[in-house]
Amino acid sequence: MQYPAATAEGLSGPLSGAYTLPAFKFQPRRESIDWRRISAVDVDRVARELDVATLQENIAGVTFCNLDGEVCNHCRQPVDPVLLKVLRLAQLIIEYLLHCQDCLSASVAQLEARLQASLGQQQRGQQELGRQADELKGVREESRRRRKMISTLQQLLLQTSAHSYHTCHLCDKTFMNATFLRGHIQRRHAGMADVGKQKQEQPLGEVLEELRAKLKWTQGELEAQREAERQRQVQELEMARQREMEAKKKFDEWKEKERSKLYGEIDKLKQLFWDEFKTVANQNSTLEEKLKALQSYSMTESHLGSLRDEESEERLKHAQEVQALQEKMEVQKTEWKRKMKALHEERAAERRQLQEENERLHVSLSQDQKKAAAQSQRHINALRAQLQEQARLIESQEETIQTLSLRKVEEVQEMPKAVATEEDSSEEELEASLEERQEQRKVLAALRKNPTWLKQFRPILEDTLEEKLEGLGIKRDTKGISAQTVRRLEPLLRTQREQIARSFREFPSLREKLNKEVSSRVKQRWESTTQPDGQPPVKSQRVTLATREVRPKTRTLTVALPSKPAEPSTPTLQGHSSHGPGLTQVSTPIPRPRVHGPSSTPVSPGSGLSSTPPFSSEEEPEGDVVQRVSLQPPKVLPRSAAKPEDNWGWSDSETSEESAQPPGKGSGGLASSGTLVQSIVKNLEKQLETPAKKPSGGVNMFLRPNAALQRASTPARKSQLSEDESDVEISSLEDLSQDLGQKGKPKPLSHSKLPEKFDVSPWSSGSRPRIPGW
């Protein structure tokens, strides 16, 4: 028992000062061991899993059981005494350890109670310390306030009078009366009383002089301090001004650098756009040449009597190539748009970055720098406005180029959709010309010098036109518009014209002036081109043919194209028939030789016979073919010679139709019924819409136009001609004057040999061309 006692002494050693250990005594063991419960315990599992709960359950039964009467179950012999001694020793150790555990638990509980008490005492001490700190702070404030009060009272005492107080000459204390002063001197300055008396005997003047000297010295010190402070402030201001000047200089340098960088980027963008534009123009010209080559290759020649094409596969191949080229052009346009969008986004990002940098610099600058920054900002805004003005100028020039290209390629007899779009383009042209007339003249001069630019701009103009048509509600693949669509678009177009007219007050007078100018020019040119032998000029058929043949590169194709019907020579043939040989009408016309003789009876263009036979052999010489198509000056009838020159030399059928109309609606009344262009278009439509009788042996080599398309285009055309404010008339006057100037010089055919299959009779209904809409 010495070892447990030593252990208990060692354990209770640190806690002996805190409390005393209770008395310990081993308990007697009378209970028997529960072998069934012990056998149910898995010792290996308890050791492996650290099952403390199982140990707590069995600790009491193992510690306080009696093992003296236990015997072996097999041999019925008592337990080995040595083993029994070991077991009893283990029981005693466990009991002692339980006692130590209880003591330690009690000690921990006691220490926790003491810790809680100490924490409470510490909290109370902190509260008391805070309260005392507050009291100390209040006492200090009170002391400071009383000190100020005492100093104020002393100053008041000094300021009241020199005889109302008594100052100690040995210290700086002051007293109310002499008794207090004497007591003070006797208490504090007993050994210096004699010296004090001598000082008191000094005259008051010396004291005043001394005080004045002190006052002057103090004032000098104050002046010196003020001067030093003033010098320091001046130096600080000078340094600040120098810093501001340096910052302003740096800002100006940065601004110049940014401006030069911006100008360089603008120049690069301009050069890039110009290169892209040249590339697009070259590609467009190349593609158009390829397209024309394919179209020329796609021409096929059908033998007489054969109604099917001999090269359908080749034509299909060419059509596929054309479609592939168009798709390639669309892909290129998409790529260009994407590049433009990326460039705009990059420009916007750079602009935002510059604005952020500018704002940051504005915040860091002083007042003078802010003024300079505001001035630079105004300059930047002015430059930006100039850039925007240049962009608007470029857009207006592009619109002018588009309208000019539309003016060069427009047809007299086009679809209503193209008419409506060209009206919008002409309105934009008028607005741009009123704003930028000088730049427009330069563009016109450049276009006159290089007409091939119009061919290069055509795809771009087509895209712009299609976008505008889509904006008006007309789809991209529409071949024509109905009368209902025309009626729906008329109010919109009329409203747009009214808005433009309100914005330009001088529009009516300018329109009237241009109308008179063009009318006089056309009349002068018409009179100047009159034949010298007194014969009247060529009829409207010649004008129509010249108008058709002047533009073989734009809307219409040559006569040799089989896939798209070209402009026929029907008006010319009809002109020949109206003034050709005297032939009587028969029920069944037969082919006759081309014999010209005097006419005895005038025949109208609609019902007369042509001098050209409906069929021609393939062995005809080239000279005969050209002779059939070329214009011949007709012989004038006696009643047509009596007409004045103001009738402009129209055909007999037109003269009869105009004489039947009421006054003011013919082609001679330009001031009341409309412009000259409307009269010419009406006469051309009358000539083309005149029905013709087809012979029994004739073969129609052209596709018949769609009747629904004709019915749809008729009201739209009438609506176009009824609008006096249509800008199509203004855009086509210059081309019309040029066409009238070339009326006597028809453009030769594009091929040396004209296919005989196109030498058809004038009564064929397929002679009217089909004008495709964009």
Swiss-Prot record:
<keyword id="KW-0969">Cilium</keyword>
<keyword id="KW-0206">Cytoskeleton</keyword>
<dbReference type="GO" id="GO:0033365">
    <property type="term" value="P:protein localization to organelle"/>
</dbReference>
<feature type="region of interest" description="Disordered">
    <location>
        <begin position="415"/>
        <end position="435"/>
    </location>
</feature>
<dbReference type="GO" id="GO:0007224">
    <property type="term" value="P:smoothened signaling pathway"/>
</dbReference>
<feature type="region of interest" description="Disordered">
    <location>
        <begin position="515"/>
        <end position="674"/>
    </location>
</feature>
<comment type="subunit">
    <text>Interacts with SEPTIN2.</text>
</comment>
<keyword id="KW-0963">Cytoplasm</keyword>
<dbReference type="InterPro" id="IPR013087">
    <property type="entry name" value="Znf_C2H2_type"/>
</dbReference>
<keyword id="KW-0175">Coiled coil</keyword>
<dbReference type="GO" id="GO:0045171">
    <property type="term" value="C:intercellular bridge"/>
</dbReference>
<keyword id="KW-0479">Metal-binding</keyword>
<feature type="compositionally biased region" description="Acidic residues">
    <location>
        <begin position="421"/>
        <end position="433"/>
    </location>
</feature>
<dbReference type="GO" id="GO:0072686">
    <property type="term" value="C:mitotic spindle"/>
</dbReference>
<dbReference type="GO" id="GO:0033504">
    <property type="term" value="P:floor plate development"/>
</dbReference>
<feature type="modified residue" description="Phosphoserine">
    <location>
        <position position="426"/>
    </location>
</feature>
<dbReference type="GO" id="GO:0005930">
    <property type="term" value="C:axoneme"/>
</dbReference>
<dbReference type="GO" id="GO:0008270">
    <property type="term" value="F:zinc ion binding"/>
</dbReference>
<dbReference type="GO" id="GO:0060271">
    <property type="term" value="P:cilium assembly"/>
</dbReference>
<feature type="region of interest" description="Disordered">
    <location>
        <begin position="686"/>
        <end position="774"/>
    </location>
</feature>
<dbReference type="GO" id="GO:0005654">
    <property type="term" value="C:nucleoplasm"/>
</dbReference>
<feature type="compositionally biased region" description="Low complexity">
    <location>
        <begin position="597"/>
        <end position="616"/>
    </location>
</feature>
<comment type="function">
    <text>Involved in primary cilium formation. Probably acts as a transition zone protein required for localization of PKD1/PC1 and PKD2/PC2 to the ciliary membrane.</text>
</comment>
<dbReference type="Pfam" id="PF13815">
    <property type="entry name" value="Dzip-like_N"/>
</dbReference>
<feature type="zinc finger region" description="C2H2-type">
    <location>
        <begin position="166"/>
        <end position="189"/>
    </location>
</feature>
<dbReference type="InterPro" id="IPR051241">
    <property type="entry name" value="DZIP_RILPL"/>
</dbReference>
<feature type="compositionally biased region" description="Basic and acidic residues">
    <location>
        <begin position="515"/>
        <end position="526"/>
    </location>
</feature>
<protein>
    <recommendedName>
        <fullName>Cilium assembly protein DZIP1L</fullName>
    </recommendedName>
</protein>
<keyword id="KW-0597">Phosphoprotein</keyword>
<comment type="similarity">
    <text>Belongs to the DZIP C2H2-type zinc-finger protein family.</text>
</comment>
<dbReference type="GO" id="GO:0032880">
    <property type="term" value="P:regulation of protein localization"/>
</dbReference>
<dbReference type="InterPro" id="IPR032714">
    <property type="entry name" value="DZIP1_N"/>
</dbReference>
<feature type="coiled-coil region">
    <location>
        <begin position="204"/>
        <end position="450"/>
    </location>
</feature>
<dbReference type="GO" id="GO:0005829">
    <property type="term" value="C:cytosol"/>
</dbReference>
<keyword id="KW-0863">Zinc-finger</keyword>
<dbReference type="GO" id="GO:0061512">
    <property type="term" value="P:protein localization to cilium"/>
</dbReference>
<feature type="modified residue" description="Phosphoserine">
    <location>
        <position position="425"/>
    </location>
</feature>
<dbReference type="GO" id="GO:0036064">
    <property type="term" value="C:ciliary basal body"/>
</dbReference>
<dbReference type="GO" id="GO:0021532">
    <property type="term" value="P:neural tube patterning"/>
</dbReference>
<dbReference type="GO" id="GO:1905349">
    <property type="term" value="P:ciliary transition zone assembly"/>
</dbReference>
<dbReference type="GO" id="GO:0005814">
    <property type="term" value="C:centriole"/>
</dbReference>
<keyword id="KW-0862">Zinc</keyword>
